[in-house]
Amino acid sequence: MSIISTRLNSIKPSPTLAVVKKTLELKKAGVNIIALGAGEPDFDTPDNIKEVAITSIKDGFTKYTNVDGIPLLKQAIKNKFKRENNIDYELDEIIVSTGGKQVIYNLFMASLDKGDEVIIPVPYWVSYPDMVALSTGTPIFVNCGIENNFKLTVEALERSITDKTKWLIINSPSNPTGAGYNCKELENIAKTLRKYPNVNIMSDDIYEHITFDDFKFYTLAQIAPDLKERIFTVNGVSKAYSMTGWRIGYGAGSKALIKAMTVIQSQSTSNPCSISQMAAIEALNGTQDYIKPNALNFQKKRDLALSILEKVIYFECYKPEGAFYLFVKCDKIFGTKTKSGKIIANSNHFSEYLLEEAKVAVVPGVAFGLDGYFRISYATSMQELKEACIRIKQACNTL
């Protein structure tokens, strides 16, 4: 009898973290690799947030807290939802967890039974399907390629709904594409969902504050307050405040769901880090002056990367509304032969080719459910980004 559970047979380690690990190994070996695989901002956590954390340590705020988050932080989250999204939540409709990933994991563990279906638009953040599967649910994939601007249409949504559908996932702006749903698109989705009262919606808003040009962010509970009891909104401090390592995410939904998720959390991690919670209060309540400049900085990087990569004859690029990724269509390159005689047959092969030939680490599209694409993160310096994109272009020109 194996010591490893059969539950893990269909679960894969995070492919993005695998790319990061391989990149670090090559760098350690002295290879001049430019890493465009990581999904985290390249600026540091702001000083005012760090200072609150340091003070919290010195003041001895180092003990257990409420499992679902300290009331002061939940109040800051409640105020954030009202201030920025015009949504009213009570404190017992909010949970704080060890990152947005744990919020989502708790959500599915608390709500899914065997055979319950979760509609996942493709491409997707790599962890959605595996978290659904670990919770005994069934992922239902809906292709939303570049021809649909990487967004779910109401026609595709209706075709995917069955009497077993329990959740629909909406991620806007999206990882890996940066595509964002505008107000009208969300209204159309809400209109469709009103016909299906068995379907709940998880809105993953983690990239809310990284948007570009004239795109205006909306979240579904703001657009459709009548569906609020069926909507679970996920957010956190990782992206907007560059606090990926602090591990604070939060979610808001019905009291019954929050209570069930708190039970799950009480038997796994218990409370999130006490010091990180105090830092998150400062992130939400303190100055927001750096958020817009940081988004503008990412916009410049997006434009730089696009200006180089869209000139590659093999590529088709989508101009993202937010986040810090490009999800580039590259299937025209499939079937070509490298100088060493290898055939590039899929996105894994192409990513390996870029790593070997261009010394640039990217994530293959198959990791996000769509072969024929690759993802770059432009959360790096302008100099490194420009050099990496030039290397990619040159590597493609030699094929």
Curated annotation (Swiss-Prot):
The record marks 12 as: Important for prephenate aminotransferase activity. It comes from the Bacteria. L-aspartate binds at residues 39, 125, 175, 375. It is an enzyme of class 2 (transferase). The modification N6-(pyridoxal phosphate)lysine is found at residue 239. GO terms for cellular component: cytoplasm. Keywords: Aminotransferase, Cytoplasm, Pyridoxal phosphate, Transferase. Pfam families: Aminotran_1_2. GO terms for biological process: amino acid metabolic process; biosynthetic process. It catalyses: L-aspartate + 2-oxoglutarate = oxaloacetate + L-glutamate; L-arogenate + 2-oxoglutarate = prephenate + L-glutamate. Its main location: cytoplasm. One of its GO terms (molecular function) is L-aspartate:2-oxoglutarate aminotransferase activity. It is found in: Cytoplasm. Its EC number is 2.6.1.1, 2.6.1.79. Its cofactor is pyridoxal 5'-phosphate. InterPro entries: Aminotransferase_I/II_large, AspAT/PAT-like, NHTrfase_class1_PyrdxlP-BS, PyrdxlP-dep_Trfase, PyrdxlP-dep_Trfase_major, PyrdxlP-dep_Trfase_small. Catalyzes the reversible conversion of aspartate and 2-oxoglutarate to glutamate and oxaloacetate. Can also transaminate prephenate in the presence of glutamate. Belongs to the class-I pyridoxal-phosphate-dependent aminotransferase family. Homodimer. This is Probable aspartate/prephenate aminotransferase. It comes from Rickettsia typhi (strain ATCC VR-144 / Wilmington).
